Amino acid sequence: MQIKLANPRGFCAGVDRAIEIVNRALEVFGPPIYVRHEVVHNKFVVEDLRSRGAIFVEELDQVPDDVIVIFSAHGVSQAVRQEAAGRGLKVFDATCPLVTKVHIEVAKYSRDGRECILIGHEGHPEVEGTMGQYDASNGGAIYLVEDEEDVARLQVRDPDNLAFVTQTTLSMDDTSRVIDALRTRFPNIGGPRKDDICYATQNRQDAVKQLAGECDVVLVVGSPNSSNSNRLRELAERMGTPAYLIDGAEDMQRGWFDQAARIGITAGASAPEVLVRGVIDQLKAWGATGAEELDGRPENITFSMPKELRVRSLI
């Protein structure tokens, strides 16, 4: 068995920044540091931060007064921000800047009284945060669609005053079809020059397509609640390659590889490289050889830290 590694894979700039915000807050202020929602959707990362003093909660009413709170990389609604401000909580915002870009778009549509359609997965925290940027008091509304069927059923107030945005971690292929359906149904709809799917999601999806074309089995390292990791598994399967989403080496079954000569490995944007290395080690223990890195698109993007953490971490 030969191992092939997708490139790029694993952590993106937004995830790096979010994890570093929690780490630096723990270093500068000491535990406990409260984090609203899992800072990124990866069990290994969350458990590591929890062991160092991070406390993960789903709502701010679980947070005591006079503590530090971090908003997760997925972003939060305006209502959550207002609740935190009203309580005087010290907040560090780990929202991915590319998610914030979508928030700004939605807020502008709201101010302009323009109805907005969000393409995304119901119940995902990023979707909840993005929907929560829209203030319907200006007379508009925001709608959520996931697929072409949702578009066909959608009833809007003013089809000539519409715009769309997208969740950042969707399948590019699926989203393109939904956008086409929106433009067909609502010819005057506006939107971003390109969809809002982030560079890292696009790069990892392109890489897994290449990987699936060269391998007999694909392993996607990522947690079950990770949207972008699930999309990677789906893309590999659509290319006719068996694919498995695993948190780590302990989730693998030897029988998956009985007929496999080439095993591909990738990782979602919230999965650390240490988990990939653990998978490689286990496969080698089962007789696999090598670990060839495929050619891929280089990523050199970084996002800045909040100023207070940047400065105080140097003291």
Swiss-Prot record:
CDD domains: lytB_ispH. Its EC number is 1.17.7.4. It catalyses: isopentenyl diphosphate + 2 oxidized [2Fe-2S]-[ferredoxin] + H2O = (2E)-4-hydroxy-3-methylbut-2-enyl diphosphate + 2 reduced [2Fe-2S]-[ferredoxin] + 2 H(+); dimethylallyl diphosphate + 2 oxidized [2Fe-2S]-[ferredoxin] + H2O = (2E)-4-hydroxy-3-methylbut-2-enyl diphosphate + 2 reduced [2Fe-2S]-[ferredoxin] + 2 H(+). Coiled coil: none annotated. Dimethylallyl diphosphate binds at residues 41, 74, 124, 226-228, 270. Isopentenyl diphosphate binds at residues 41, 74, 124, 226-228, 270. GO terms for molecular function: 4 iron, 4 sulfur cluster binding; 4-hydroxy-3-methylbut-2-enyl diphosphate reductase activity; metal ion binding. Its cofactor is [4Fe-4S] cluster. The active site is at residue 126. Keywords: 4Fe-4S, Iron, Iron-sulfur, Isoprene biosynthesis, Metal-binding, Oxidoreductase. It is an enzyme of class 1 (oxidoreductase). Catalyzes the conversion of 1-hydroxy-2-methyl-2-(E)-butenyl 4-diphosphate (HMBPP) into a mixture of isopentenyl diphosphate (IPP) and dimethylallyl diphosphate (DMAPP). Acts in the terminal step of the DOXP/MEP pathway for isoprenoid precursor biosynthesis. Belongs to the IspH family. This is 4-hydroxy-3-methylbut-2-enyl diphosphate reductase. The gene is ispH.
